[in-house]
């Protein structure tokens, strides 16, 4: 899996799926309470105090790219 985040603390992965989002969060040590389950916009937020740490493990892209990943791969 490849992880992507932006400077607004949004976090997704490819291949994109709810199951993979949860696996990614577990791998990065992010609690499930940071998951946003709004249909068609599912993603994790990065806890502010861990932003730099998590960014070092991801490809940092702009917010439009995060939305593109979600939109192209979301079942809803």
Question: Residues of each region from the PLM?
Answer:
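Catalytic phosphate/metal-binding cores of nucleic-acid and nucleotide-processing enzymes, i.e., regions
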Residues: 1-76
């Amino acid at each position: 899996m490849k992880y992507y985040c932006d400077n607004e603390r949004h976090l997704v992965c490819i291949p994109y799926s709810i199951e993979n989002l949860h696996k990614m969060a577990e791998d990065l040590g992010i609690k499930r309470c940071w998951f946003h389950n709004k249909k068609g916009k599912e993603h994790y937020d990065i806890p502010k105090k861990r932003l730099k740490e998590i960014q070092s493990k991801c490809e940092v892209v702009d917010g439009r790219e995060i939305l593109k990943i979600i939109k192209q791969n979301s079942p809803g």
